[in-house]
C-alpha cells in the first residue's frame, strides 16, 4: 500500500486536503480562499533558498543582530519607563534553576512551596518599599497594573464615572487605561503640569468633583519630576476619591519617601528596574500594593503564610478572586499566567541589594543626574526648563528640533534621550534624558561635550 504524498514539514497529505475540502462541500483550495480579493493574493511561488547549515544560520543571525543599537555599543541615556540598571550576575543564574524557570504558578500551588515562598517574599518587598499593607503576586507590566488599579478604585467608589489622571503619567499607561475602560462608560479627565513639572494643583482641585472615583499620579513622573504626595492627597480626600500612585522607575524607592506614608491607597508601577534588563521592551513585571481595607478587591494571585496540620510554616494562595475560582460576576480580574519569573528576578535582585544596596543605587542615580543636568544647563542656549525636584530623569530644551539633535548624538554613538514630542505634541525642541548608576563621570562629561558640539554645528 502506497503512503499518501506528504511534505516533510506539513502534516496534511494531498489526500487529507481533498477529504477536508469534500467535507465542507468545495472542490479546491482556490474556492476556500475566494473571499480574499485577487489584488492582494500572491500569484507566484515564493523564491525560498535551500536549507542553511548551522554555521550559515548563526552567521546570518549575527549579521542581523549588528543592526541593533544597544547600550553595549552605544552610550545610552534612554528612559521613559525602561531603564538600564546593573543586574547582578547571580540573578540570571538563579533564574535558570529548573524549579523556577517558568512564568506559570501551578494549578496545585501548595505542592510547590518553593515557588509560593518566592512570591510571598516578593510581596513582602513590595509592602516594605511602598509603605502599604498588601501586595499581589505581580501583574503583566506597569500600564496594566494602573488599569487594574483604576478598575479596583471604581469597585470601591461605586456610582461614580470619572477618573482623574495627571498628564505627566506615562502617556502609554494612560492610553492603556483608555483602552481598558472605553466600553465601560467611564471618563478620563487629564490634568496638566505647571512650570515646575508637577501636577497643576489648581487644575486638580477643579477637576476633583463628586463624580470622580480616583486620582492617579506618577512620581517620579514621566518628565522625571517628583510630585508632592501630601498636597495631592489633601485635594483627592476632599471628594473621597481613591488615591493611586504610579512608579515607573522602581529604584527611586531606595531614596524617595513611599506613597503609603503619605496616605495613598494604592501604589502600582513597573518593576523592570529591579534587576531586569531592558530587553526590547519586555517581558517586564507590574506590581500592585494596597492598604489593608482594599485587599479583597485586588486582582490576580495573592500568597499568604499559614501553618499546616503539623504546625509547620506553609504558603497558600489566598483571597483568590479570579474568574477560575469564583463566579465570573464576582471576580475582580481574569489575570491568568502573569510574570512570575520576572517577579522572581525582582525578588532576587531586592534580596541581594538589601535596603543599603538599593539606597546606594538610588543615591548614585540622583547625584549623577544632578551633575549632568548642571553640565547641560551650562551649555549656551540649552536649558532644563522644569524647576521641580527630579530623581534620575529630566527634560532638556534646545532652540533646535530634538530629533535633529538626537540624530547628531547617535552619529557619535550616544543614544541621547527620547523626543518629548513623541508623547506631547508642541514640545518638538525638548527631549527626556535618563541617568543611572551605570554612567560614569567620563560618560556624563562626554555627553555634555558632544551635545555642546552638536549645538554649535546647528548654530552654523
Each PLM stretch: what is its role?
Residues 144-312, 381, 396, 403-407, ...:
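Conserved PLP-enzyme active-site core in the AAT-like
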Residues 97-109, 125-132, 158, 181-189, ...:
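Gly-rich Lys/Arg/Thr-decorated short loops/hinges at beta-loop-alpha junctions or inter-strand turns
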Residues 1-21:
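Charged, compositionally biased N-terminal leader segments and the immediate start
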Residues 34-121:
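N-terminal entrance/gating region of PLP-dependent enzymes' catalytic architecture
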Residues 16-22, 124, 422-460:
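PLP-dependent enzyme catalytic core of the Aspartate aminotransferase-like
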Residues 274-380, 384-387:
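Active-site C-terminal subdomain of aminotransferase-like
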Residues 107-111, 115, 123, 127-147:
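Short loop-beta-helix segment that forms the pyridoxal 5′-phosphate
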Residues 387-389, 412-431:
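Conserved PLP cofactor-binding pocket of PLP-dependent enzymes
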